[in-house]
Amino acid sequence: MAKDLMQMLAADIVLGDGGMFLEANWRGYDVPEIIGTNPQALQQIHRDFHNAGSQVLQALTWFTSSAELEARYGWQDRVEEINRTAIEAAKAASGGSAPVGGCLVSTKTGSRA
């Protein structure tokens, strides 16, 4: 079971898995395509960060809004599946021992002030 993030933060410095997007690109994968076509590779990237000392993993949810998935791959009907897969890959990488966070990115719907 994942440790409580607030307890971890209260006790010490907590290391995250910086650079998931860039690491996926460096390994030759397109984001977010890797989520829908090769979740095992995504899980391996998370595992590598965890094995390197990351205590918290961030699900690779960049460009996973309906608008982005439609524009890039015609995957507008796969939004829930893609996001769930991204989260599950991060959770599985640590065997459930690390907390997993997500990110909110631009929805391109005018949400910026």
Language-model segments: which ranges?
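Domain-level signal for soluble alpha/beta catalytic cores
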Residues: 1-113
